[in-house]
Amino acid sequence: MSYGLLRPLLFTLDPERAHTLSIAALEALGHMPRGLARVARRYTAHDPRLAQDFWGLHFANPVGLAAGYDKDARATAALPALGFGFIEIGTVTPRPQPGNPRPRVFRYPAQQAVINRMGFPGEGAAAVARRLAALPGHPVPIGINLGKNKDTPLERAQDDYVAALELLFHYGDYLCINVSSPNTPGLRLLQGEEALRGLLKAVAAANQRLALQHQRPPLPLLLKIAPDLDNDDLNAIGSLALGTAPLVNGFIATNTTIERPASQPGLSESGGLSGAPLLQQSNAVIAQLYRATQGQVPIIGVGGILSAADAYAKILAGASLVQVYSGLIFRGPGLVREILEELPGLWLKDGYPDLAHARGSTA
């Protein structure tokens, strides 16, 4: 059944109920090799022009799944069959927590937007570690998005990130430090330069310690930032990835926004806004980060991608890779293959020989 036929049925359900059903279906599919192969044939696009390498990892294509969908690594075995070049699970907190009261997810089909105030619900890092340990391998890179528990005081936030890192160190290909969700009280205060530098120093030290202890390279550390920062903040954050001893190896830009477009007054629920209204705001942050880092630091662009043109706009702004989530709600899983099949034509039409030459050209 095509997603166009299925979507009206899914949209009669509570958004969180629809999400739970999709996770359950993919979790079951992960145990069905023949089913996975059929799904992969339908949704996977193979094109060597899309392949890139960052942080010592190979990305067969630049389109990943953003954190927020597979919070507890239940669907991780099946998700590569949908054509993603990489998967980011989480957000994972060190201890289980229920998140914020329901309802906490709201669809706006006319605006192709979602507002959520989830608050990092999840089973905790130990449960996620057990599931990831059971995977037979990583056909695509797997990132793990880390957050702090709601009841952990801000002054002890670094303890939560380090605790989660210690539990998950062996099971991800990169780690993302999430200090930008608007749905955990005070979390965005950790984006302040002094607090952020202290947090990242603690996480980087733990990463190096674990690498030495287990005689393996440290994990690439990425930082996920909000779209609501000004250019001075972005310049300061960009500096954390520069120099001889960078505290982070890349950025994910951006999380959801707390701002509401004046042109769309119907987006009234509190929480983080994602989807189409976030596209331009996210792109502006990507471009500023690209300039602040002189294009030397990989950026994963996320926010408002509903087409290949949207993904390409993020690459032009300076993104090396992109992620989708809200776009899948409105366009379905075929969005990934559509982007991958159309991207080369977009950069060739603009006269670029490859993806790397297109990157950052409008920043």
Curated annotation (Swiss-Prot):
A single Gene Ontology CC term: plasma membrane
InterPro entries per the UniProt record, alphabetical: Aldolase_TIM, DHO_dehydrogenase, Dihydroorotate_DH_2, Dihydroorotate_DH_cat, Dihydroorotate_DH_CS
Name recorded for this polypeptide: Dihydroorotate dehydrogenase (quinone)
Enzyme class: oxidoreductase
Annotated EC: 1.3.5.2
GO MF terms, alphabetically ordered: dihydroorotate dehydrogenase (quinone) activity
Pathway: Pyrimidine metabolism; UMP biosynthesis via de novo pathway; orotate from (S)-dihydroorotate (quinone route): step 1/1
Gene3D superfamilies: Aldolase class I
Domain of life: Bacteria
Chain positions recorded as substrate binding sites: 71, 116-120, 178, 183, 255-256
Binding-site positions, FMN: 67-71, 91, 145, 178, 224, 254, 275, 304, 325-326
Assembly and oligomerization: Monomer.
Gene that this sequence comes from: pyrD
Organism in which the protein naturally occurs: Acidithiobacillus ferrooxidans (strain ATCC 23270 / DSM 14882 / CIP 104768 / NCIMB 8455)
